[in-house]
Amino acid sequence: MEPKEKKQKLDTSEVASPSLSKTHLKKKKTKKQKIRKSQEITSPSLSKNTDLVIASPSLSNIDVGEAMKKQNDVAIFLTGIVISSVAKNSNFVFSPASINAALTMVAASSGGEQGEELRSFILSFLKSSSTDELNAIFREIASVVLVDGSKKGGPKIAVVNGMWMDQSLSVNPLSKDLFKNFFSAAFAQVDFRSKAEEVRTEVNAWASSHTNGLIKDLLPRGSVTSLTDRVYGSALYFKGTWEEKYSKSMTKCKPFYLLNGTSVSVPFMSSFEKQYIAAYDGFKVLRLPYRQGRDNTNRNFAMYIYLPDKKGELDDLLERMTSTPGFLDSHNPERRVKVGKFRIPKFKIEFGFEASSAFSDFELDVSFYQKTLIEIDEKGTEAVTFTAFRSAYLGCALVKPIDFVADHPFLFLIREEQTGTVLFAGQIFDPSA
């Protein structure tokens, strides 16, 4: 199938989230020798999901529920540092799950003294106690969250992982087995030393083919060189339909107010049906469930929109989210309420970035190349979500209808609600851009 043109409208929303990064330890400033940027992490995301072979008996001793809760906070933490470094006051979307998966593969395969130090930094960065804990999280996400449900009426989900290693490096049979059987990853030995550009093209083709042609040129020219040792890849694709679709006849153009005091006219979806909305001090949260299908995974997917009450307070809301442990689980609408004015904008954004500066404060020089595409329309969107078990909103059922008009900048997440996995996170400053 030929890749779709970039301007072609998707029949529903389609999200692909690749990312690629060079990773190496940051050396002390006193050392003047040039350090090779030896590892690269690519994180697109689309794949066939098969049962994972678990090689480590110790994984069974991990409290996966507690480990997953920590990853919810890590996802918001990642969102905050990436937005502050590369997407201040602009449309933005990325995949925390892709970054987590790529770093997990790096941590699991890093050997030697330098590898041990790298692994230690990654564990600290992801707030995990061990590589076993990271692997247990990976297993839970792969076996529960990312199972394709399209044949039973649920979301279309696919995930694929890959690793490219220079042919001059020795291959540890255990590491190779780990990638193939645990991470279900493709493994290839390539020639970075004399054919770096060809390998870059190969990785970009891999990312494109596993995201239905939606993600092109993941790795920019010059990102892979003769000094590259490894490239890790993790691709994710999600396509879901709203539990309750919106009527196109009710979609009307209305003003969306920008931070500079002007406005743009964009199409807003609307509905008179009850919605999952909760009001908090200074902001509201809307939960939009996806159709779940008839499988036995007990998964639930949803998009969350976090809307500040005032137009210029999105940064304050993000700061509150990133500094409050358990924020997502404690700010989760649990009941449908009657709505007064209800409007959310249609939007389609594509965002690519290289975010080495985002990690500079953590003594871990990780340069991520990630591209993500998301579209929201009357039929649905692409993303994964987790439904929290409790809500801080303890009021009785609302008597008066509640308004939810997303006509100014807001944050959004897509989560799987059983595990809390944040697949996609972003912000909208101008739906017309």
Curated annotation (Swiss-Prot):
Record field: transmembrane: none
Composition-biased stretches (Basic residues): 23-36
A GO CC term assigned to this protein in UniProt: extracellular space
Superkingdom, natural source: Eukaryota
GO molecular function: serine-type endopeptidase inhibitor activity
Tissue localization of expression: Weakly expressed during seedling development.
Annotated region (RCL), positions in chain: 380-404
Site (Reactive bond): L394, G395
Sequence segments annotated as region (Disordered): 1-43
Residue spans of biased composition, Basic and acidic residues class: 1-12
Gene3D superfamilies in the record: Alpha-1-antitrypsin, domain 1 (2.30.39.10), Antithrombin, subunit I, domain 2 (3.30.497.10)
Family the UniProt entry places it in: Belongs to the serpin family.
Entry domain remark: The reactive center loop (RCL) extends out from the body of the protein and directs binding to the target protease. The protease cleaves the serpin at the reactive site within the RCL, establishing a covalent linkage between the carboxyl group of the serpin reactive site and the serine hydroxyl of the protease. The resulting inactive serpin-protease complex is highly stable.
PANTHER family according to UniProt: SERINE PROTEASE INHIBITOR (SERPIN) FAMILY PROTEIN-RELATED (PTHR11461:SF347), SERINE PROTEASE INHIBITOR, SERPIN (PTHR11461)
Protein name: Probable non-inhibitory serpin-Z5
